[in-house]
Regions:
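ATP/Mg2+ or Mg2+-diphosphate-binding catalytic cores
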Residues: 312-381
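Active-site activation/catalytic loop segments of kinase-like enzymes and analogous catalytic loops
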Residues: 260-295, 306-328
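Intrinsic-disorder-associated, low-complexity terminal segments enriched in Asp/Asn/His/Tyr and depleted
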Residues: 3, 7-11, 26
Length: 381
């Protein structure tokens, strides 16, 4: 296999060349101020990781939310941009800090407005333009639940996850923020590059991609009715509580596009075990809810095309990581730290899913045997 580049960072960002303003609403973020300022600790605290960062963050939390911080941990690893803060009085919060202040402001504003309409997202406790503290969502990651569930249980929890995304879409419309967030994936070059990932994988394995009507694919993917979408709606970004309620966190990549994109991001992730019957049933049930007024035939065509290309994007990212890291990754570590699914079964399952979704749409049905060939070549890596 020759070197394989991935366009996934641009795909996730939602633009190729021209970054757009992250929030066009009028209201500005304001930090919450605690009425009681906690005096500094009399003795230095001992932190397990990143002591200087933890000292500063603990002081910030205490100044604005009161109480005494007893512990700060990094469940996803110390290289991640989020950590868990614990107070002596039992309170907890998730602290996140984004490299791009525009994305931080976007995330805070979207969560603020969605919370006004009881959407299943965390409540913001504090924000100062860089650091955001939000409520801790109790439960288990959706990706972990899916890995350990049988087919009926997977159908149930995926249906709950799709219902919660639909609830978020409705809340965004009520809040009037569809036009306040940036349009993502609207550049023609961005869409063309997304489609080209097929050729990159084909070139890497020396398996020519069948001829496709790229102009029609491009037209299908143009977001002509942009609405708020989470966009990065991976199962790893959802928490399921004891009642089965699914809540969504990590909103820095949200924007305005086709609501069906959230359905695609969820169902076409490599952490979702492939089951054609389950996915067909979910598409039948939820495509009408995510269609946003489009005729069902048009909505199903969009879902099929976007789903095939999303599987391709995830596959390209996985193969790029596999080559760069010189091998497949540990499955349990992937689940524990919400890493990309760089395993042979997950890569091949993306091929199976892409072929299955392609079989439903004439514009991409020629890719069915091609994905089977790719899956066979992946076996040799």
């Amino acid at each position: 296999m020759s070197d394989l580049s991935t366009h996934f960072p641009d795909y996730l960002a939602g633009y190729r060349e021209t970054p757009c303003p992250f929030w066009s609403g009028n209201s500005a973020p304001r930090p919450l101020q605690s009425s009681t300022i906690t005096p500094p600790p009399t003795q230095p605290r001992q932190w397990q990781e990143r002591p200087y960062f933890c000292d500063n963050l603990a002081r910030l939390c205490e100044e604005n939310l009161g109480g005494r911080v007893s512990d700060i941990t990094f469940p996803g690893g110390s290289d991640r941009s989020a950590c868990l803060v614990r107070w002596e009085d039992g309170r907890t919060a998730i602290a996140s800090f984004r490299g791009e202040t525009g994305r931080a402001r976007l995330e805070e504003r979207v969560l603020h407005h969605l919370n006004q309409y009881a959407a299943p997202v965390p409540n913001v406790l504090f924000f100062n333009g860089i650091v955001m503290l939000q409520e801790t969502l109790v439960g288990e990651r959706l990706s972990t639940l899916l890995a350990n569930a049988d087919a009926p249980a997977r159908h149930t929890v995926l249906a709950s996850a799709l219902s919660s995304l639909h609830q978020i879409h409705l809340a965004a419309a009520q809040a009037g923020i569809d036009q306040a967030v940036p349009v993502i994936g609207g550049e023609e070059d961005w869409i063309a590059r997304h489609i080209r990932q097929l050729r990159k994988i084909g070139d890497a394995f020396e398996i020519p991609v069948p001829a496709l009507d790229k102009a029609s694919l491009q037209d299908i993917l143009l977001p002509l009715k942009p609405r708020l979408v989470k966009w990065d709606a991976r199962p790893g970004n959802a928490m399921v509580d004891a009642t089965g309620k699914v809540s969504w966190f990590d909103w820095e990549h949200c924007g305005a596009r086709n609501r069906l994109d959230d359905l695609v991001w969820l169902l076409c992730d490599e952490s979702v075990p492939f089951c054609s019957a389950t996915e067909q049933a979910l598409l039948t049930e939820f495509v009408p809810l995510f269609a946003d007024g489009a005729p069902l035939e048009v909505a199903h065509r969009y879902a099929a095309v976007a789903g095939v290309l999303h599987c391709t994007a995830r596959l390209g990212l996985i193969l790029h990581k596999q080559q760069g890291e010189e091998g497949w990754w540990d499955r349990q570590e992937i689940l524990d730290y919400d890493y990309i699914g760089v395993t042979l079964p997950q890569a091949q399952q993306l091929c199976a899913r892409a072929a299955d979704w392609a079989s439903r749409e004439p514009l991409v049905v020629s890719l069915v045997p091609w994905f089977a060939d790719v899956a066979g070549h992946i076996e040799t890596l």
